[in-house]
């Protein structure tokens, strides 16, 4: 099999990339606030996973879904939590 494989072919017309970027943009607020050591770790792992393994934001979010969900609930960030859960239900 030659060429690249698009593992998101079933997500055609779902805007998964834009939706993932929106969630990451909202998570950036938590990363910048640095109120929990996890956020620095998450930012570092995101960079590593993207650069070294070629993973996109949807996959990075999926890798940390339970922790992200818990922290967003604890912080009362229900809007970002809803966006994350929508990604989970529709695209993960």
From Swiss-Prot:
Any Pfam family: CowN
Coiled-coil segments on the chain, per record: none
Residues annotated as transmembrane: none
The keyword NAD appears for this protein: no
Domain of life according to the entry: Bacteria
Entry keywords, A to Z: Nitrogen fixation
Keyword Zinc among record annotations: no
Disulfide bonds: none
InterPro entries associated with the record: CowN
GO biological process, one term: nitrogen fixation
Family, per entry: Belongs to the CowN family.
Function: Is required to sustain N(2)-dependent growth in the presence of low levels of carbon monoxide (CO). Probably acts by protecting the N(2) fixation ability of the nitrogenase complex, which is inactivated in the presence of CO.
Designated name of the protein: N(2)-fixation sustaining protein CowN
Species name: Rhodopseudomonas palustris (strain BisB5)
């Amino acid at each position: 099999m030659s060429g690249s494989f698009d593992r998101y072919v079933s997500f055609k017309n779902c805007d998964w990339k834009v939706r993932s970027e929106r969630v990451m943009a909202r998570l950036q607020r938590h990363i910048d606030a640095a109120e929990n050591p996890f956020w620095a770790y998450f930012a570092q792992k995101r960079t590593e996973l993207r650069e070294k393994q070629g993973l996109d934001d949807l996959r990075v979010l999926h890798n940390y879904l339970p922790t992200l969900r818990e922290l967003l609930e604890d912080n009362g960030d229900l809007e970002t939590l809803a966006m994350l859960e929508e990604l989970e239900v529709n695209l993960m």
